[in-house]
C-alpha cells in the first residue's frame, strides 16, 4: 500500500505517477460524493451566483454589468448548459498589482460572466467541503472568520490557562504562488467522483502555469482543502494537537511547554515539505503573556488589542481624508474591528466618538423608493409547484427586466427564507385581500398549476 507519507521519498519526475497510484487506492476504499453538478445547475444556485457577482452599483453600471443585467435569463441558461455538459472554459483574465498588509500581490481578474460560473460551482463545492474542515480553521468559510476564530482562541486561553502558556506561530511562504496543482487535484479527487465537476475544477486550478490564482474564487477552497488534508487533520487526528488554529496560510498552536511546541513545529515542517511548501523563517515559540499577534489583533488571556499597524493606518487615513462621507465609512470599518476587542478608549481617542452598539442607535434601513426589502434568494415560481410554503409578506409595483408592475412575494420553504416574482393578477388580488385581514399573514399554502385558454398555464394558491 502506497501512502501520502511516501511522497517525499520519491524523485520529482516520479511523483506524479505515485500521486495517481494513491488516488486509485483512495478511490477504491473511500466513499466519495457524486451528483454535485445537479446541485450546481439548480436555478436558485445559478441565480444566487449571478446576483452575488453583480452586487454593487459600480458593477451594475459597468459595460459588462449592463449587458449581463439586460440578458440575465439568457446568461443563466447558457452557463447552466455549459456547466451541465462540462464544456465551460475560462475565457482569460487580466492582472492587477495590489498591496495588502504591506505585501504586493498580483491579482488575476476574470470577466463577470466567468465569475458567475466559478461562483456557482464553488458555492456548492464549498458547502460540501466545509463539513470536512476542523472547527478551528476560518478563512473563506461561511459563518466563520477572523472574529469567530479569535473568540475560539480567547475561550481556550481562559478555560485552560495551564495548557496554553506558550504559542507557536507560523506562516507559509508565498502560499498561492507555490501550491502544487497536482496535489490540489489529488485532494479534490479524494472527495468528489463526478468527472464533469473534476474537469471544471481542474480548469480553475490550472488557470496559471504554476500555483493557484490569488483572485479566483475557487482558489480559496482549493487552498483550504489542501491544508485541511495535509496539515489540519494530520495534526488533530494523528498527533491529537488540541489547540491548533489556521486562517488561510497563517497558523497558531498553543501548548503547555516550549518543548511540546517545538516538536509540533517539526511535524508541521515535515508535512509542508511533502507538498513542496515552506514555512517562513519568522516563525517563533513564545510565552502567551507577550501577546499573540494574530488575525489583526494582539490576543492575551485577559484582554485583546488591535494590531499596532492597523491603528496607525486608520489614524493616517483619518488625517488625510477630508470627505465627510469617506470619513464615516472609515469610522464604520474601524468600529467593526474595535468592537471585537477591548478598545473603547482607543476608538474615542481616534474618532472623537463614544463606541455604541448598533442596537443602541435604534435605526433601520429606509429605502428611498419606499418599497419593502425581503431576505432570501430569488427562486423561480416553477420550483415551488407542489411544495408546502409559508407566505409571509409581499410588495407590488416592483420594476424588473420583465415588466414595470411586478409583485415580489416573501416566503419560507422548510424554514429557509426565499422570494419569488409574479405578474399574476389573481395572486396579486388574493394577497391584497389577505393583507386587509387582521391576522392574514403569514399563511400556509401550496402553489399549483392550472391550464386555461389554449394550453396556457397559470400558478395559483391552494
Can you say where each PLM-predicted feature lies in the sequence?
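Non-catalytic, polymerase-adjacent accessory regions of viral genome-replication enzymes
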Residues: 1-77
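Conserved polymerase palm-domain catalytic core
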Residues: 75-78, 82-83, 92, 101, ...
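OB/S1-fold single-stranded nucleic-acid-binding modules
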Residues: 355-396
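OB-fold/S1-family single-stranded nucleic acid-binding modules
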Residues: 449-462
Amino acid at each position: 500500500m502506497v501512502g501520502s507519507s511516501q511522497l517525499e521519498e520519491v524523485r520529482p519526475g516520479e511523483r506524479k505517477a505515485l500521486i495517481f497510484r494513491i488516488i486509485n487506492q483512495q478511490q477504491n476504499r473511500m466513499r466519495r460524493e457524486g451528483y454535485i453538478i445537479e446541485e450546481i445547475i439548480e436555478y436558485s444556485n445559478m441565480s444566487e451566483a449571478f446576483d452575488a457577482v453583480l452586487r454593487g452599483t459600480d458593477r451594475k453600471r459597468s459595460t459588462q454589468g449592463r449587458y449581463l443585467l439586460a440578458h440575465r435569463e439568457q446568461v443563466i441558461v447558457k452557463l447552466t448548459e455549459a456547466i451541465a455538459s462540462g464544456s465551460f472554459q475560462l475565457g482569460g483574465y487580466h492582472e492587477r498589482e495590489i498591496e495588502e498588509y504591506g505585501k504586493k500581490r498580483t491579482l488575476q481578474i476574470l470577466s463577470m460572466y466567468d465569475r458567475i460560473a466559478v461562483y456557482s460551482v464553488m458555492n456548492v463545492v464549498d458547502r460540501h467541503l466545509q463539513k470536512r474542515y476542523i472547527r478551528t480553521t476560518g478563512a473563506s468559510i461561511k459563518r466563520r472568520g477572523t472574529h469567530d476564530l479569535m473568540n475560539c482562541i480567547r475561550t481556550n486561553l481562559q478555560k485552560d490557562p495551564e495548557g496554553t502558556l506558550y504559542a507557536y506561530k507560523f506562516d507559509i511562504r508565498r502560499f498561492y504562488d507555490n501550491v502544487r496543482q497536482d496535489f490540489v487535484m489529488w485532494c479534490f479527487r479524494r472527495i468528489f467522483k463526478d468527472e464533469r465537476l473534476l474537469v471544471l475544477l481542474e480548469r480553475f486550478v490550472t488557470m496559471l502555469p504554476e500555483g493557484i490564482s490569488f483572485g479566483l474564487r475557487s482558489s480559496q477552497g482549493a487552498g483550504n482543502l489542501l491544508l485541511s488534508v495535509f496539515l489540519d487533520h494530520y495534526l488533530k487526528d494523528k498527533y491529537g494537537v488540541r489547540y491548533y488554529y489556521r486562517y488561510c496560510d497563517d497558523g497558531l498552536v498553543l501548548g503547555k511547554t516550549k518543548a511540546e511546541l517545538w516538536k509540533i513545529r517539526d511535524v508541521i515542517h515535515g508535512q509542508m515539505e511533502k507538498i513542496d511548501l515552506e514555512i517562513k523563517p519568522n516563525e517563533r515559540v513564545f510565552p502567551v503573556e507577550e501577546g499573540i499577534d494574530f488575525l489583526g489583533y494582539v490576543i492575551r488571556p485577559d484582554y485583546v488589542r488591535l494590531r499596532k499597524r492597523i491603528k496607525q493606518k486608520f489614524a493616517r487615513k483619518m488625517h488625510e481624508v477630508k470627505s465627510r462621507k469617506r470619513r464615516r465609512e472609515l469610522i464604520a470599518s474601524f468600529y467593526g474591528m474595535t468592537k471585537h476587542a477591548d478598545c473603547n478608549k482607543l476608538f474615542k481617542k481616534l474618532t472623537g466618538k463614544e463606541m455604541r452598539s448598533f442596537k443602541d442607535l435604534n435605526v433601520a434601513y429606509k429605502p428611498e423608493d419606499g418599497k419593502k426589502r425581503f431576505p432570501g434568494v430569488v427562486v423561480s415560481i416553477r420550483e415551488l409547484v407542489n411544495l408546502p410554503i409559508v407566505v409571509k409578506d409581499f410588495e407590488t409595483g416592483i420594476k424588473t427586466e420583465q415588466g414595470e408592475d411586478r409583485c415580489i412575494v416573501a416566503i419560507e420553504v422548510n424554514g429557509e427564507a426565499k422570494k419569488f416574482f409574479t405578474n399574476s393578477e389573481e395572486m396579486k388580488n388574493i394577497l391584497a385581500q389577505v393583507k386587509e385581514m387582521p391576522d392574514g399573514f403569514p399563511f400556509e399554502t401550496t402553489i399549483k398549476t392550472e391550464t386555461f385558454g389554449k394550453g396556457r398555464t397559470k400558478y395559483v394558491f391552494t
